């Protein structure tokens, strides 16, 4: 009897240790779109938006905070939207291409789905976002290669009328642009000889940008933001020092006026600036004791 009990116990243990076979997951589980993604909140905080499948393509939905009802504001059937963002409290902009050609164009629509506009729907032309000008509801800075397929020029786009204004012809070496607090294009960053970086500057859009500083691959200067009066800039630089520092700088000469923050051990990894309040909030760096610091 004792032997039978031992055998029964061993059999029960063997059954308990037998691994359970997990059900196979269907292939579409790995490739299908998520039910909802890319959540964003409107600038005034009254609405939120997200992307969700409709007709098997990702489209944009808008929902009022506190409501259970969402409004679909796009109706794309051929291609997923590449991305979207809020232009202001009442309008959303999005990018899409045609047939997978990756020539992304800019479109806009109101949050109730009305007043759709194709801002840059030019065949063979690609659009990039340079500066959404978050504090200027009706304007933004975009780049397109409509003048030259190899070069992106900056334009000011009026979201109400769709009018584009060329701000500067890119000679071909400019890789980035920067605006002041009035939305004026003032700074260009160019790559010289594939190695060196050149900062170009102008006082107003009536002028051409001119070179003010060229740095090699060991040096760095970047403008984080203009001061509230648009006369000087907050810059991160390692010129004349081993580690990056946050300084006040004259953009017309790249002359340092004041050191605002420096760390003898670590480089800065970020500068926090409030566009709404027009002031520095702090800086960050990576280290063992890396807090967010107010300069």
Identify what each model region corresponds to.
Residues 1-4:
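Positively charged n-region of N-terminal signal peptides that target proteins for export
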Residues 6-10:
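Sec-dependent N-terminal signal peptides
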Residues 15-16:
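C-terminal motif of bacterial Sec signal peptides marking the signal peptidase cleavage site
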Residues 31-37, 43, 55-60, 75-82, ...:
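Peripheral, non-catalytic segments that deliver or gate enzyme domains
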Residues 63-64:
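Short Gly/aromatic-enriched secondary-structure transition segments
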Residues 20-36, 67-70:
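A short helix->beta-strand "capping" segment at the edge of beta-propeller domains
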């Amino acid at each position: 009897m004792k032997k039978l009990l031992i055998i029964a116990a061993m059999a029960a243990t063997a059954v308990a240790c037998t691994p359970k076979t997990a059900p196979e997951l269907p292939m579409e589980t790995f490739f299908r779109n998520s039910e909802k993604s890319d959540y964003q909140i409107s600038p005034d905080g009254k609405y939120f938006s997200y992307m969700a499948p409709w007709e098997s393509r990702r489209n944009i939905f808008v929902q009022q905070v506190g409501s259970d009802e969402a409004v679909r504001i796009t109706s794309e059937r051929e291609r997923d939207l590449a991305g979207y963002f809020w232009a202001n409290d009442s309008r959303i902009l999005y990018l899409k291409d045609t047939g997978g050609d990756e020539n992304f164009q800019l479109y806009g629509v109101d949050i109730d789905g009305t007043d759709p506009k194709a801002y840059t729907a030019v065949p063979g032309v690609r659009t990039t976002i340079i500066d959404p000008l978050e504090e200027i509801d009706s304007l933004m800075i975009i780049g397109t290669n409509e003048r030259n397929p190899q070069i992106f020029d900056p334009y000011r786009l009026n979201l109400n009328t769709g009018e584009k204004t060329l701000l500067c012809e890119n000679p071909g070496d400019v890789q980035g642009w920067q605006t002041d607090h009035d939305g004026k294009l003032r700074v260009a960053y160019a790559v010289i000889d594939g190695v060196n970086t050149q900062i170009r500057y102008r006082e107003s859009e009536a002028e051409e940008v001119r070179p003010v500083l060229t740095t090699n691959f060991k040096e760095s200067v970047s403008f984080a933001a203009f001061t509230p009066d648009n006369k000087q800039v907050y810059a991160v630089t390692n010129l004349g020092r081993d580690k990056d520092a946050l300084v006040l700088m004259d953009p017309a000469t790249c002359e340092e006026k004041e050191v605002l923050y420096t760390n003898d051990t670590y480089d800065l990894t970020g500068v926090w600036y409030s566009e709404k309040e027009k002031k520095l909030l702090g800086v960050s760096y990576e280290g063992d004791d890396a807090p967010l610091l107010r300069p």
